[in-house]
From Swiss-Prot:
<comment type="similarity">
    <text>Belongs to the KAE1 / TsaD family.</text>
</comment>
<keyword id="KW-0479">Metal-binding</keyword>
<keyword id="KW-0809">Transit peptide</keyword>
<dbReference type="InterPro" id="IPR017861">
    <property type="entry name" value="KAE1/TsaD"/>
</dbReference>
<feature type="binding site">
    <location>
        <position position="226"/>
    </location>
    <ligand>
        <name>substrate</name>
    </ligand>
</feature>
<keyword id="KW-0819">tRNA processing</keyword>
<dbReference type="InterPro" id="IPR000905">
    <property type="entry name" value="Gcp-like_dom"/>
</dbReference>
<dbReference type="GO" id="GO:0046872">
    <property type="term" value="F:metal ion binding"/>
</dbReference>
<feature type="modified residue" description="N6-acetyllysine">
    <location>
        <position position="203"/>
    </location>
</feature>
<feature type="binding site">
    <location>
        <position position="147"/>
    </location>
    <ligand>
        <name>a divalent metal cation</name>
    </ligand>
</feature>
<dbReference type="GO" id="GO:0002949">
    <property type="term" value="P:tRNA threonylcarbamoyladenosine modification"/>
</dbReference>
<feature type="binding site">
    <location>
        <begin position="329"/>
        <end position="330"/>
    </location>
    <ligand>
        <name>substrate</name>
    </ligand>
</feature>
<keyword id="KW-0007">Acetylation</keyword>
<keyword id="KW-0012">Acyltransferase</keyword>
<dbReference type="GO" id="GO:0005739">
    <property type="term" value="C:mitochondrion"/>
</dbReference>
<feature type="modified residue" description="N6-acetyllysine">
    <location>
        <position position="140"/>
    </location>
</feature>
<feature type="binding site">
    <location>
        <position position="358"/>
    </location>
    <ligand>
        <name>a divalent metal cation</name>
    </ligand>
</feature>
């Protein structure tokens, strides 16, 4: 979603009485003895209030989520104070639903894991404040979670994936390529120099007024573009992928957005319609934008694979590429990445679409991973703060660019 403002402020702090009443609402019968680790994960980094209970074997014992998509579609993007208020209104209910569904008493939890970075400050604050109150009442360890690390490691919940592996994280707020060498060991190969791909898709969908399209009125921008693109001609407009001559693994999407805006303005004049009306060529525009984005993602990822293999950071055969984040739920982009992995003797793995978007399961699982590895488990919660901006791992993107790797052309027959 498009972020309309960057409001900062003091985060919501639930009263101790409310948390105490919340805990008293659980009346579990004794008898079940949990012999393994169980983590409650809480996610409020953007516009989804989510919670889940996961055990160390990867079983999802309970989950709940409240999506704000419908509200933000009406405002044309996420308004942080509005998102904060919706998190406040729903977080207690969502956590309670996840715990109730799991059948796990709060006292039987091994730890509580919560997203504290990166994300919208006001949204992060709600989740952190609620979690710290809960941790204080239950006297449980607290595990701070990096949102993008959680996306990267989700695949280890659904598939047996060993380190190292390459991950492409693509969402509404992020776009990066990283080598995952361990639970908390990441090498950043490239990132977006401007906006994220999901943000760009939302802006294009908004400019095309797809919320007025009868088939797309309840869809997020990215989903609307993917849906409409199936009906369009991806070659109707000639748009070159961004950073075509830059031999690194960085991404850029503002140029693609601006070119698309010009095409839309031109077509509006040709069709004699005003801004805000649906173009007859909307499906062709959606298909072209989606295809161009896919080609851009593939080329940068191709270079990352070649770089990692040249430096023996990945095995020469059967290396794993993981695509995660909300945009990775786009099946056209997945098929494009499959063409790449087939050409480079790699294996493409993607979490199920529902685990690509923000969710509590990935946060709880990241907590399990850290609990097993003994990393970042806090018993003293004094001074913990959320971090709206936070890099991922060690940045070696300059080294990647200096390698100046030429990428062979691939036939994108999708």
């Amino acid at each position: 979603m498009l972020i309309l403002t960057k409001t900062a402020g003091v985060f919501f702090k639930p009263s101790k009485r409310k948390v105490y009443e919340f805990l008293r609402s659980f009346n579990f019968h004794p008898g079940t003895l949990f012999l393994h680790k169980i983590v409650l994960g809480i996610e409020t980094s953007c516009d989804d209030t989510a919670a889940a209970v996961v055990d160390e074997t990867g079983n999802v014992l309970g989950e709940a989520i409240h999506s704000q998509t419908e509200v933000h579609l009406k405002t044309g993007g996420i308004v942080p104070p509005a998102a904060q208020q919706l998190h406040r209104e729903n977080i207690q209910r969502i956590v309670q639903e996840a715990l109730s569904a799991s059948g796990v008493s709060p006292s039987d939890l091994s730890a509580i894991a919560t997203t504290i970075k990166p994300g919208l400050a006001l949204s992060l604050g709600v989740g952190l404040s609620f979690s710290l109150q809960l941790v204080g009442q239950l006297k449980k360890p607290f595990i701070p979670i990096h949102h993008m690390e959680a996306h990267a490691l989700t695949i280890r919940l659904t598939n047996k994936v060993e380190f190292p592996f390459l991950v492409l994280l693509i969402s509404g707020g992020h776009c990066l390529l990283a080598l995952v060498q361990g639970v908390s060991d990441f090498l950043l190969l490239g990132k977006s120099l401007d906006i994220a791909p999901g943000d760009m898709l939302d802006k294009v969908a908004r400019r095309l007024s797809l919320i007025k399209h009868p088939e797309c009125s309840t869809m997020s921008g990215g989903k609307a573009i993917e849906h409409l693109a199936k009906q369009g001609n991806r070659f109707h407009f000639d748009i070159k992928p961004p950073l075509h001559h830059a031999k690194n693994c960085d991404f850029s999407f503002t140029g693609l957005q601006h070119v698309t805006d010009k095409i839309i303005m031109k077509k509006e004049k040709e069709e004699g319609i005003e801004k805000g009306q649906i173009l007859s060529s909307a499906a062709d525009i959606a298909a072209t934008v989606q295809h161009t984005m896919a080609c851009h993602l593939v080329k940068r990822t191709h270079r990352a694979i070649l770089f990692c293999k040249q430096r023996d950071l990945l095995p020469q055969n059967n290396a794993v590429l993981v695509a995660s984040g909300g945009v990775a739920s786009n099946f056209y982009i997945r098929r494009a990445l499959e063409i790449l992995t087939n050409a480079t003797q790699c294996t493409l793995l993607c979490p199920p679409p529902r685990l690509c978007t923000d969710n509590g399961i990935m946060i709880a699982w990241n907590g399990i991973e850290r609990l097993r590895a003994g990393l970042g488990i806090l018993h003293d919660i004094e001074g913990i703060r959320y971090e709206p901006k936070c890099p991922l791992g060690v940045d070696i993107s300059k080294e990647v660019g200096e390698a100046s790797i030429k990428v062979p052309q691939l036939k994108m027959e999708i």
